[in-house]
């Protein structure tokens, strides 16, 4: 089972990403992929206290309350094996993101092709 968590404060982006990942998961059911989306870093961290950290976390960088880079640090404290992928419209945080050994840094606007 591959657990993917998405955190983006933009409901439209969160919905598009979640729908695309779920469509991929349905088409590749042999991989056992589950996707869960969260509207804020705090909602994601609260859930992880109950369920544990995901295998992959797709994080918006610029969110109110807590930056995605800060959220990544918290996730990596919980599980150093979680792959982090940042999604952002800004390249200002690229150095910080890669210092966290991010698996990828995808620039918004999000398109399905950017995940391939």
Residues covered by each model-derived region:
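Conserved SAM-binding loop
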Residues: 6, 37, 86-87
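Switch/coupling loops of ABC transporter nucleotide-binding domains
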Residues: 2, 33, 82
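Conserved acidic segment of CheY-like receiver
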Residues: 2-22, 57
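CheY-like receiver
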Residues: 45-46, 51-116
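Short, well-ordered amphipathic alpha-helices
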Residues: 15-25, 44-45, 72
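Short helix-capping segments at alpha-helix termini
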Residues: 25-30, 78-80
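Short hydrophobic/Thr-rich beta-strand motif most characteristic of the beta2 strand and flanking loop
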Residues: 27-40, 47
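Cofactor-binding loop segments of dinucleotide-utilizing enzymes, especially the Rossmann-like FAD-
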Residues: 9, 40, 89
